[in-house]
Regions:
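Charged, gly/pro-rich active-site loop segments
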Residues: 1-8, 81-155
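Structural motif corresponding to alpha-helix initiation and N-cap regions
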Residues: 14, 59-60
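Extreme N-terminal tail/first-helix region
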Residues: 1-23
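Short solvent-exposed loop/turn micro-motifs enriched in small/polar/acidic residues
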Residues: 22-24, 37-38, 87, 136
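Short beta-strand segments
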Residues: 24-58, 74-75
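Short secondary-structure boundary/capping segments
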Residues: 18, 44, 64, 86, ...
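Helix-adjacent hinge/juxtasegments
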Residues: 61-89
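A generic structural signal for nonpolar/aromatic side chains embedded in well-ordered alpha-helices
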Residues: 21, 65-66, 115
Length: 155
């Protein structure tokens, strides 16, 4: 899916958009089904090998939506600053579109290791032990980036 950006003067390059995704701590996963409508959920993630990955429980709302319609979007908001005197906001954000699928085996283990490196870099060994304990109780979902876009406003 590719949705054109109306304000071309605020459009970021793909490299700038990927930089926001790389630096972000959390993003919003957006999904939709005919039966339930739209559903957005904040979660942490890693960007690795041209895909967004997130972890979740074996069962739950996210998995129910993805099983019904795996076409999703994922948005990360980077730096923001309210500009009270200008009645506006400086911001940067990036969004990707893709099809969510579950990964298993060594790819799953490597992605979980990427989570430890990103969110707990001072606890790698403990993180590996945690991965081993929770491996079978965790799903890893991959969203290969089919399209990326980003916008920013800087005064």
């Amino acid at each position: 899916m590719q949705i054109p950006i109306r304000r071309q003067d605020r459009k970021l390059t793909d490299a700038e958009s990927l930089s926001i995704l790389t630096k972000g701590e959390y993003g919003i996963l957006s999904m939709c089904t005919i039966e339930n409508g739209g559903y957005g959920v904040p979660l942490n993630y890693v960007l690795w090998n041209s895909a967004i990955y997130f972890h979740c429980a074996i069962e739950g709302t996210k998995m129910n939506f993805i099983k019904t319609n795996n076409q999703v979007s994922f948005c990360v908001v980077g730096r923001t600053e309210i500009l009270p005197s200008k009645f506006g906001t400086e911001y940067e954000s990036a969004m990707i579109f893709g099809k969510a699928t579950e990964v298993e085996g060594e790819e799953k283990r490597e992605v979980l290791t990427q989570f430890v490196k990103k969110y707990s870099p001072d606890f790698i060994q403990e993180g590996i032990q945690y991965i081993n304990q929770r491996f079978d109780k965790t799903r890893i979902i991959k969203i290969p980036i089919e399209h990326v876009s980003g916008k920013s406003r800087k005064e």
